[in-house]
Amino acid sequence: MRLVILSAVFLFSYFSNLFSQNILQSVNPETQGISSGRLKQVDANINQWIKEGQLNGATAIILRNGKIVYHKALGFSSENVPMKTDNIFRIASMTKPIISVAAMMLYEEGKFLLTDPISKFIPEFKNPVVLDKYNAADTTYTTVPAKREIIMRDILSQTSGIGYAQIGSATTNAIYYKNKINGGIGTPYSTLKDVITKLGKLPLFVQPGEEFYYGLNTDVLGYLIEVISGMPLDKYLQQKIFQPLGMKDTYFFLPKEKQARLVSLYSQGNNKMSIQDSLINLNGTFSRDFPKTINGTYFSGGAGLSSTAYDYALFGQMLLNGGELNGKRILSPATIQIIVSNQIGELLMWGDANKTRRFGLGFGILTEYAERTLMIPAGSYGWDGMFASHYWTDPKNKMVVVFMRNIWPTEHWDYGDRIKPLIYQALK
């Protein structure tokens, strides 16, 4: 009897694991209205970039109608090590959409309104001030009172006035460095509570709600999730998003048994690719190998996750499905609609005079201008990562695309745009 029970448990475990690994099924592209022959342009161009020394390697996955029509690894993940489709990448700011979805799950539970001041949950943000004058010689500054408090919508839409440490302007870098505020990536020790409560006492750089000002907003959002849910951010994500969706390779800090699959972070300069020292100075400490940290404690909501192309495609397909995948509902369709709707009005993103993108709640939303230049339909949404990774969901064509690289700095950020016509020209 014991043998029968053990056999049954084994079979259940085996088939459960097998099923979880195949939530997304690979099919012939032709069955989904995509030309296999024309899709070869993707391979041809990526291989050419590798041959020219502009790229070490990449993985890409394309879904249409919930099916995998393309999933390949090209080039090398490290020196003389071929890239594989299950290689793990530092996804940097592609973390932001995931954290934004996690926060909106709490919104659906009635835990906050988008108009709530964040000081309701983090008192240090009460009575904010805005930078007025700054003296670069001694890093002193004066401030003026903010016109209003930061609200949850500001944090989710990057309009709070909070800046970025380490990779921001010279002024934000200096003020944050002096106050030991890091950029949230590559600095695994410390905690969200320590950093965000200090951040709340520092000046904003523009008035809340008046500009799109890319900054540490999603790190703040990560701490808000911890405060509101009562759970550490990493545990909340595992329980509420990663496990339900079958995202088995997405972490802030990788388990030891998965670390060998992490690709090297290359650098590019003078048309050459190289692997630099792990620890570099970037207006503060930055470790290229931060995902391998043992017992890391800083869960950067803005840039800290590592993942595979397949895992991220699961997340993208959930959004395309209106918040559900494989029988597990993460968000309602109504909430998804809020997330991917323009939340910044006519505010420009990084001086984008062509208004190529608008911003929702954690997602960039492409406009008609992008459709006219890159073939990607208006209303498609997604985000990119500092280390040259790219993701978008295209509701019109029922597509999800993830293009993973790990290069910083790179002379060819534009490959994220160049790959778009290569994909869309293959549609029948």
Where are these regions (language model features)?
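Structural recognition of the beta-strand scaffold that forms the well-ordered cores
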Residues: T59-I61, H71, D154-S157, Y213, ...
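Active-site SXXK
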Residues: D43-N47, G66, F89-I118, K126, ...
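Structured C-terminal helix/loop/strand segments within mature extracytoplasmic catalytic/sensor domains
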Residues: W383-K428
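Short, surface-exposed loop or secondary-structure junction motifs
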Residues: V129-A378
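Short, conserved catalytic-motif segment at the N-terminal edge
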Residues: I23, V27-I91, K111, V130-N135, ...
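Extracellular/periplasmic catalytic domains that process cell-envelope and extracellular macromolecules
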Residues: Q54, P82-M83, L113, T143-E149, ...
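Bacterial Sec-dependent N-terminal signal peptides
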Residues: M1-I23
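Short, conserved phosphate/pyrophosphate- and ester-handling motifs at nucleotide-, phospho-/glycolipid
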Residues: S35, K96, T308
